[in-house]
């Protein structure tokens, strides 16, 4: 029987099991199965996945994110805010501004601290990737995919593809509560046009500075929030002429609000909370 200490945290209800790999050890070959086991709501702790906070050669810390199906993702906006909170509060970093390595690249985090606790985290998510090759999706490599039609159940849905280090398909609807989240979501996620699968977002524009948001996450299904998805939604809204670049947009997710801005300089900034749920020790056994 093996075990490790963990902290369960969430960003707007998007919860992960966080493991401090400066102190803990999980064999590389076990990571996918451990992520699946610990995320199980009935036989594990229950979460949207597992995130490792690791040493890095190029930043103070490195984030590795695993979905609850065991697949490894390249980035996670809500996860990054929680990693920023954990790293500062556990003295893995000293400054309130620092970098985090991800499989999608290095991002910059800035934390707001009150009485020694991080109350808010802002992440510079970098520039969005808009070509098919960068997303990635099939088709002409250098061509963006903006408001193209997808036929499902005799209804045409127009979506825009954006990568924020992970792929997103953003669909505008009149009412997110009536969107085909659990039906169209998994169909698009696994469609052959996306060789690495895709996250699917449904967006309802409220005004020039607010939107409602619902998400079907690649490898996890319906979740309360998706930080990279919120960033992709704002970028897609601007590309489609629905919102203005440079303004801070409030994205209303099922779990709460994020503030997102696609700056004139090109990067996307995400600001929101990160909270600790509990600490504990998880025991597991890998069958031979």
From Swiss-Prot:
Transmembrane segments: none
Record-linked Pfam families: DAP_epimerase
PROSITE patterns: DAP_EPIMERASE
UniProt-annotated catalytic positions: 76 (proton donor), 226 (proton acceptor)
Residues that hold substrate according to the record: 14, 67, 77-78, 166, 199, 217-218, 227-228
Compartment(s) of residence: Cytoplasm
EC number: 5.1.1.7
Gene3D superfamilies reported for this sequence: Diaminopimelate Epimerase, Chain A, domain 1
Name of the top EC class for this enzyme: isomerase
Any one Gene Ontology cellular component term annotated for this protein: cytosol
Function noted in UniProt: Catalyzes the stereoinversion of LL-2,6-diaminopimelate (L,L-DAP) to meso-diaminopimelate (meso-DAP), a precursor of L-lysine and an essential component of the bacterial peptidoglycan.
Family: Belongs to the diaminopimelate epimerase family.
Cited PANTHER family: DIAMINOPIMELATE EPIMERASE, DIAMINOPIMELATE EPIMERASE, CHLOROPLASTIC
Name this polypeptide is given: Diaminopimelate epimerase
Organism: Bacillus cereus (strain AH187)
Gene name of the record: dapF
